[in-house]
Amino acid sequence: MCGRPGDDGDMRSAVDVTVTGRVQGVSFRYYADREADRLGVAGWVRNEPDGTVAAHVEGDPGAVAAFVRWCHDGPRLAHVEQVDVRDGTDQGLRSFGVR
């Protein structure tokens, strides 16, 4: 996760995440949205046609890292097999949403 100063001068990082396993049909996106809100990160989460869940997350580097850690477990009904994380581009997003 690379960091850069945001508009307010605070360091920000951004990552793109792909979560593989039983992650659709188990409210993964709903709980990811709640976790993002709790952590104060911005971005989005969506289901992909191949059965994975994709997310773009940006904000405080520690909060982004905490979101990625949460993705390794996900909600109670999920069965996460793999979490791929790539450096993303900070888009200056200020909220998180389900797509």
From Swiss-Prot:
Its EC number is 3.6.1.7. Belongs to the acylphosphatase family. The active site is at residues 29, 47. It comes from the Bacteria. SUPFAM superfamilies: Acylphosphatase/BLUF domain-like (SSF54975). The gene is acyP. Residues 14-99 form the Acylphosphatase-like domain. InterPro entries: Acylphosphatase (IPR020456), Acylphosphatase-like_dom (IPR001792), Acylphosphatase-like_dom_sf (IPR036046), Acylphosphatase_CS (IPR017968). This is Acylphosphatase. Keywords: Hydrolase. One of its GO terms (molecular function) is acylphosphatase activity.
